[in-house]
Design a protein with these regions (language model features):
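Short, well-ordered coil/turn segments that N-cap beta-strands
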Residues: 3-7, 35-38, 65-69, 94-96, ...
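Glycine-rich, proline-tolerant flexible connector loops at the mouths of alpha/beta enzymes
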Residues: 35-57, 103-113
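Conserved N-terminal beta1-alpha1 strand-loop-helix module at the mouth
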Residues: 1-41, 51
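Alpha-helix-loop-beta-strand connector modules within alpha/beta enzyme cores
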Residues: 48-72, 115-137
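Conserved anion-binding
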Residues: 97-155
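Active-site mouth loops of central-metabolism enzymes
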Residues: 7-25, 69-81, 133-154
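A generic, well-ordered mixed alpha/beta core segment in the N-terminal half of proteins
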Residues: 73, 83-106
Length: 155
């Protein structure tokens, strides 16, 4: 029987660009000492510029701290053009792992039509940037917006 060593990972939220990220950068240096398997970097849904937040922070973690990084990409408020630009920006800094998400719907803000489901985003990434590793997520009990389990599995 093989003994498996547990792995440790973290998920970080880029701060509001107006506030700055000095505290987060210090916390990341402390996390580095714990040798995490990876750190995932979230992205806000339509609130901040992904390049200034998610891409910049993922770049710092992967290239300055040498910790493998996964960038979140919530698609519901992104156009195909914006996703293609973001993939290019991530490629330029060497971050090639994406957590593809639909993203939360924000009351009062109309979602774009390019990516209704995370599966639409995944198909787009596989076509536009096939060298990226794409990770998905799901709700074990079924997505709350899905009309049925079958529909949930299909999307």
């Amino acid at each position: 029987m093989t003994k498996q060593t547990p792995s440790l990972s973290f998920e970080v939220f880029p701060p509001n660009p107006e506030v700055g990220n000095a505290k987060l950068l210090r916390a990341l240096e402390n996390m580095q000492e714990l040798a995490p398997h990876f750190i995932s970097v979230t992205a806000s849904n339509n609130k901040y510029n992904i390049k200034e937040t998610t891409v910049a922070l993922a770049n710092h973690i992967q290239n300055e701290l040498s910790i493998p990084t996964i960038a979140h990409l919530p698609a519901i408020y992104l156009s195909k053009e914006k996703v293609a630009d973001t993939l290019h920006e991530l490629d330029q800094v060497g971050v090639h792992r994406i957590l593809a998400l639909r993203g939360d719907i924000i009351p009062g803000i109309e979602p774009l039509k390019d990516f209704r489901y995370a599966t639409d985003l995944i198909e787009f990434i596989k076509t536009e940037a096939p060298h990226f590793d794409v990770i998905g997520a799901c709700y074990p009990e079924g997505h709350p917006d899905s009309p049925s389990q079958i529909s949930d599995i299909q999307n």
